[in-house]
A protein has these predicted regions:
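Catalytic-site microenvironment of enzymes
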Residues: 2-14, 18-358
């Protein structure tokens, strides 16, 4: 027993001598520390974001190792590299995939939703005092939110102008606003059908019927305009959809008089436009959604114009960060009675099902 205590005393004395015999001495010591930054991803995965090493030095170049001394044991600490290895072995490290706009946004409660000024691109809006309304199915919801945007229907919208593109570049195609312009009408009044019915009235009726069809299939529905008028310009409507919905569908009828059929407004095949954000990150999703809608309409007996696509530089597309389409469901002379609108709603809903793989 005495021999054991004697050996321990000698060992402790040796440790103190190695450390300089004085805790206040810094001339012959080197402090080494390591920190591993670990955070949780949105999917709940543990992600190692970095290893930080710091060495605070002594005046000498002698490398020393800190040791912990207890009454009965002496333990040598590992080096920085060994510590890092141990952390890596003990921690499950998994790279997360970059977030895409196809992912569902955070679910919001049903009710009115206005434009949040902190949202991306919200500052470009000029008319934004109105509210959209979010509806949810009573049961069997699928968690997907579709923004149904009844085109037009904003009093005073044609008296205001907004920037065509977030980066200030001019339009590349002509429509309501000509190519080369840098500002566009905030919300146009729309056309009038051959029977005297305003387009805004028909788009709202279409939106209400589509809402019911989508709710019956388990979708949440964000009614961008839930009445005859909403004080939200095209940018405000788009930004609200960006932050609440999984996809954005604007309902329109064209101003021609040939009853030419349905088509979607495709993203212009112009390099400068397709390389501009947020178009660059989303135009393929816009096109895929447009094609799905046309296929759904066609399979339900709706007449399709040409190949179902017409290129157009739209404010909606220029500011959209979710799959987004302006769908033209006919023109001034097209049937817009209740039965026809129901048929159109089924075709659109089938296209939405197809796009989301349902």
């Amino acid at each position: 027993m005495r021999l054991k205590f004697f050996c321990q005393a000698m060992l402790i004395a040796g440790v103190l001598a190695a450390c300089g015999g004085n805790n206040s001495s810094t001339d012959n010591t080197a402090e080494t520390s390591s920190a591993v930054s670990v955070e949780s991803s949105a999917e709940g995965n543990v992600v190692q974001t970095g290893v930080v090493r710091k060495v605070s030095g002594s005046k000498s170049s002698t490398e020393s190792t800190s040791k912990a001394v207890s009454e009965t044991t002496v333990t040598t600490t590992t080096t920085v590299e060994e510590t890092t290895t141990a952390v890596e072995e003990m921690t499950t490290v998994k790279e997360t995939q970059p977030e895409t706009n196809a992912q569902k946004p955070e679910a919001k409660e049903a009710g009115e939703i206005g434009l949040d000024p902190s949202w991306q691109y919200a500052s470009f809006s000029k008319i934004n005092s109105g509210k959209s309304v979010l509806y949810k199915p009573s049961e069997n919801g699928n968690g997907i939110t579709i923004a149904v945007n009844a085109g037009h229907g904003t009093k005073g919208g044609s008296s205001q102008k907004t920037q065509c593109h977030p980066d200030g570049t001019p339009k590349v195609t002509s429509g309501t606003t000509k190519a080369g312009a840098t500002t566009a009408i905030a919300v146009s009044e729309g056309m009038t059908f051959a029977d005297g019915t305003p387009e805004s009235t028909v788009t709202f009726e279409m939106a209400k019927i589509l809402k019911e069809e989508l709710l019956s299939r388990g979708y949440n529905v964000l009614m961008i305009r839930d009445g005859s008028d909403v004080q939200l310009d095209n940018i405000a409507r788009t930004v609200i959809a960006n932050n609440v919905a999984s996809a954005h569908i604007a309902l329109h009828w064209d101003s021609t008089t040939a009853d030419k059929g349905a088509f979607y407004m495709g993203v212009p095949e112009v390099d400068s436009y397709r390389s501009m954000e947020p178009v660059a990150s989303n135009w393929k999703k816009h096109e895929a959604l447009g094609k799905s809608l046309i296929n759904g309409l066609s399979s339900n007996g709706t007449k399709i114009f040409s190949k179902g696509r017409m290129e157009m530089d739209l404010t909606q597309t220029s500011y959209s960060t979710v799959p987004s389409i302006d769908i033209e469901l006919g023109d001034k002379t097209s049937d817009h009675g209740n039965d026809e609108l129901k048929k159109l709603s089924k075709g659109l809903a089938d296209g939405i099902d197809s796009y989301f793989g349902r």
